[in-house]
């Protein structure tokens, strides 16, 4: 049986909030089977809890942001979410003492190391997957994202299209068969990116105050401003795929299907997830009693826990 997973022990890290520029402490705590992923604002009295769900995402303007009915929010959850998805975590309490998850270096890599350092523990309950049964597609202008059935795991295909001399045709598309190893090696280190003109505007209205060359790739009209350059020649599209992995994990379950997207972002990713879940014929829950039946991308996950 493929079992649910949580952490062996709590883990804590302190970083900077991307928009506030202030110190943020993140604490990840183990949770019992069937708890799911629950975010919590511990700086508020009483503590405000946010169970992960597609519907909890109500702002996707600059990041993926959870907002409850009272207007309380937790921003920039996507990079941590992607790391939890990659490691197959099912049950976790995510405590944060601010309105946003720390940006760290702008990628998922610090969260991967934090989670692995705490240790992954299997629980005595079957792990549920969402399996796509019918094709679902959403569009916004020329942008689109879709899921199609794919029984062998999660297949990812993402294309970006920006007019910039550094973003040539050769680095606009990335494809990957999802697994913990592939995510860690190919996606986790890909950093968020932005354009200098956008940074200047956001900071003028009190946002992105924690943004810097230490936690984002910044481009001007002609070049990349980071002295160290890129971690991958196609780091930008890899990061967009990382974002999509995190956005799609807002349902709290690993998805089995074929995901393709063109110029998609947080808004369209969430729109696709909502469209899938709203169509009862498009998906089903599945568990695997026999490990031999598990899609290949999820058969090898245990290797990264050693």
Curated annotation (Swiss-Prot):
Keywords: Hydrolase, Lipid A biosynthesis, Lipid biosynthesis, Lipid metabolism, Metal-binding, Zinc. The keyword RNA-binding does not apply. Pathway: Glycolipid biosynthesis; lipid IV(A) biosynthesis; lipid IV(A) from (3R)-3-hydroxytetradecanoyl-[acyl-carrier-protein] and UDP-N-acetyl-alpha-D-glucosamine: step 2/6. Zn(2+) binds at residues 79, 239, 243. The active site is at 266 (proton donor). The gene is lpxC. InterPro entries: Ribosomal_Su5_D2-typ_SF (IPR020568), UDP-acyl_GlcNac_deAcase (IPR004463), UDP-acyl_GlcNac_deAcase_C (IPR011334), UDP-acyl_N-AcGlcN_deAcase_N (IPR015870). Its cofactor is Zn(2+). GO terms for biological process: lipid A biosynthetic process. It is an enzyme of class 3 (hydrolase). It catalyses: a UDP-3-O-[(3R)-3-hydroxyacyl]-N-acetyl-alpha-D-glucosamine + H2O = a UDP-3-O-[(3R)-3-hydroxyacyl]-alpha-D-glucosamine + acetate. Its EC number is 3.5.1.108. One of its GO terms (molecular function) is metal ion binding. The keyword Ribonucleoprotein does not apply. This is UDP-3-O-acyl-N-acetylglucosamine deacetylase. Belongs to the LpxC family. Catalyzes the hydrolysis of UDP-3-O-myristoyl-N-acetylglucosamine to form UDP-3-O-myristoylglucosamine and acetate, the committed step in lipid A biosynthesis. One of its GO terms (cellular component) is membrane.
